[in-house]
Amino acid sequence: MNIRKRTGEVVPFQEEKILNAMKKAFSGQGQEIDDRVLDEMLSVVLKRLPENSGLTVERVQDEVERVLMECGHYEVAKAYILYREKRAALRRVRADLAREVGDDALEDLLRQIQKDFEEEVYPLSALQLKFESFCKPAMTTDAKMEALTKAAVELTTVEAPKWEFIAARLLNHTFSKRNASWWTERGVKGLYEKLRYLTDKGLYGDYILARYSREEIDTAEGFLCPKRDTLFTYSGLDLLLKRYVIQSRSREPLETPQEMFLGIALHLAMNETSGRMDWVRRFYDMLSRMEVTMATPTMSNARKPHHQLSSCFIDTVPDSLDGIYRSVDNFAKVSKFGGGMGLYFGKVRATGSAIRGFQGAAGGVIRWIRLVNDTAVAVDQLGMRQGAVAVYLDAWHKDLPEFLQLRTNNGDDRMKAHDVFPAVCYPDLFWKLAEKNLDAPWQLMCPHEILTVKGYALEDYWGEEWEKRYLDCVSDPRIEKRTVTVKDIVRLVLRSAVETGTPFAFNRDTVNRMNPNGHAGMIYCSNLCTEIAQNMAPIEHISTEVRTENGDTVVVTATRPGEFVVCNLASLSLGNLPVEDEAYLERTVETAIRALDNVIDLNFYPLEYARLTNHKYRSIGLGVSGYHHMLAKRGIRWESEEHLAFADAVFERINYAAIRADTALAREKGCYALFEGSDWQTGAYFEKRGYTSGKWRELAETVAAQGMRNAYLLAIAPTSSTSILSGTTAGIDPVMRRFFLEEKKGSILPRVAPELSLDTWWYYKAAHLIDQSWSVRAAGVRQRHIDQAQSMNLYITNDYTMRQVLALYLDAWRSGVKTIYYIRSKSLEVEDCESCAS
């Protein structure tokens, strides 16, 4: 027997649905009913139903009402009648909305929205009322859909935060219809034909179809799960469609969100030799479930012709005209393809230093930094956004006072560089003096003068050896000093930090002490977002010679490539992962590590120096986002010992899983070139971090025997953009506010803490209200398990004194925190890095 639904669809009749409806009617009135009695009533209902094709849902419900009344269940029958009327009202409002918009397909979507959002604060009647206030005569259907979506966005409140998910579904409905129509007009069907079209138009890299057969693409198409589009918030989907999916040259989005995730997966699995399609599926699943996000360049550029997948690069600027201009040129090429940059200026001679024996000839680092600043502005990625660069200088460099005023508003504008991000590299000695005696003298010196007089570069040392040599330089009368007090430097640092959010802080001795590859080099500074800590070395000029090749005269310049650091980033979305499930977490980490390792071999490098270093060390940076989200949904307060204990357990779990996955990958594909002699190989890595349990000792033995695939593993990036995509909190930061409205290009965007509810409300304490000492302690706890660094911000209010801010720096240093990113004053707006937004 069949039954006709209200939509007109004829489906098989299922009597258990009647039984369930009657059960719900009784339970809704708080009454229990014997199954035997229910069966008897069901039998009566069934006898009264027609056996011909005229059976409808309405007829069945009419009979249920009558039987309930006849059996004396008047209150239940009354509730059932009211329930039917409520359902009828729901049907009317969605039918009215679909008719008003002029989109018949909209009704099915609205029906699903009513089913998924049953709470009273999400009535479609409210959406209809808001929509009608936006609606104007003669609006097109597309304009009406935009108005409907805008209505849902503006209904998002603290009390009803899920409207942002409803708005996302409406936006996706509009996009999907338009996208399907675009492809239909061109006669393109199926994923393979889409990829062929995009490849022919130069929008998709031809390497995808060259490496995958049609059968494999068809198999991959079967992995697509459009239902996962419902995981998006409005902000996330809007950002993805505007910035991440492949667009036509007229800025029309051509990929669906799921096709984007699959395209990235196809790219990242391209070189797999065993079980390749299984890896495609695993990569696709981790991305589309929003359990892992790749860095913004990987998300944007994987599958494209110019697939620059790395976030950030670090260069050591040499102390020569050729070397400085080479570094600036390198920055321009990196910026051209969307990468951010970290530049270490600690080797460049100070103002007044000698050039070729001419005393006082050097102009110092500021003029070169201004050149970098102008390059950042000039190379603006086809007008999309200007380049981004952090410039690092040592705390004992003679030009430090001027450097600390690069971005402040007061002073000589010829000494300013407002578009770079300054950062200071601090030795332990500086913090020891700041802790004990702020009035202690602090000597600033020129690195070139030290090299000339002493025969060594002071910046090439760290720890006790650096301190011994620094004091030796201080006592050497041949070296000119610029004497200040520690307080003078601290005051300049804090004044700039409060006013501009910078300089970033880099604790060089802590970094190098915990460097697992200290046997192979030195870490001078970090990257644009302060999460990368890898060995560095300047590019060196060897020779320039004139040759004749094929009858032509050519000039050949030879250089030693140095170590030009590359950041390959991804982040675990902790708020979306069951972090207590060790097996699930291990599998997710294993998948992410493999994807990152593949980035190294599949990347388009803007510079050969970057390619050489990346293949030498095979460094990656797996980080996290959704940290506050993770805590809040588990009812853990930020300012609590429970937070510290939980973070310690989670990050130890992540680190263990990462090392285990990486050594297994080394067994399969081989070690990085410099594994021998590293802390990984000697076991010092595990000893320094107090990993002494049985399972850690066993893992250390496995690592020593099998090796490591990647020299560096973990680094926590800011994830400012990709955390929006995945609907979670950024990086390791607390939320700025539980809820606020952001105006962008004339529209209002709601920003809601993830899974905000009465249960999570009290655990989402705003960043500026949190006692920052808890954030510093948490960073120290996490740092033990992170071989690189963390993009950690400090949030201060106008009530903070300079001494309180200094205390946070000192606490961070004592806790073993390697870097501090922005000092975010409540009244200060700072720029987030796009490149490291993993």
Where are these regions (language model features)?
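Core nucleic-acid recognition elements
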Residues: 9, 32-262, 278-284
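Core structural elements
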Residues: 66-69, 139, 154, 232-243, ...
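Terminal amphipathic helices with adjacent charged low-complexity linkers/tails
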Residues: 79-93, 163-195, 426, 512-538, ...
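Long, structured ligand/cofactor-binding scaffold of large enzymes
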Residues: 142, 147, 178-183, 229-377
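Active-site cavity-forming subdomains of large catalytic enzyme subunits
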Residues: 174-227, 310-571, 578-579, 605-609, ...
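Catalytic alpha/beta core of large soluble enzyme barrels
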Residues: 213-221, 225, 229-238, 530-534, ...
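Gly/Pro-rich turn-and-neighbor structural signature
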Residues: 252-322, 469-496, 500-505, 651-701
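Internal maturation/activation junctions in enzymes
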Residues: 286, 328, 588-611, 619, ...
